[in-house]
Amino acid sequence: MEDVHWTSCTAGRNALGIEADGTIKGCPSLATATYAGGNIRDMTLEDIWLLTPELAFARTKTRDELWGFCRTCYYADECRAGCSWTAHCTLGRRGNNPFCYYRVIELRKKGVRERLEPREQAPNLPYDFGRFEIVKEPLP
């Protein structure tokens, strides 16, 4: 069991989100405006899966697309910053997961913790989210 660990965002790898109007995205949680790959009424599911970058991003993501703590993390090549929705809806872009347990453990070893401070309110749209900023501070 010790070898078990997270293996990256499953959006467009082994998950799909299908909205009521036929819009396809890699995960039901992802924002439609940014992550819609197409509509099942206009394209085949196979074409949406294979040809659209909105669904392919999790299959093709590398360490080079990561930023912040996640880019330098020991698990970066496997985890690739974990859940894309978590980072995107919190920090405005994917590639740096502020809710990672390993991250907390490693920062604690350095006597540091992180907290999120709100920077922008959610715009009151479907699948909306506000913006936060990571603030590092010494452990109390």
Model-derived regions, located:
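Short, acidic, Ser/Thr-enriched surface-loop or helix-capping motifs
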Residues: 18-19
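Short, small/polar residue-rich loop motifs at catalytic or cofactor-binding pockets
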Residues: 9-13
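Cysteine-cluster motifs in flexible loop/terminal segments that predominantly coordinate metals
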Residues: 64-110
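Short capping/connector residues at structural and topological boundaries
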Residues: 14, 42-45, 105
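C-terminal accessory region of radical SAM enzymes
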Residues: 1, 23, 29-74, 80
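Short Fe-S-cluster ligation motifs
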Residues: 55-58, 97-140
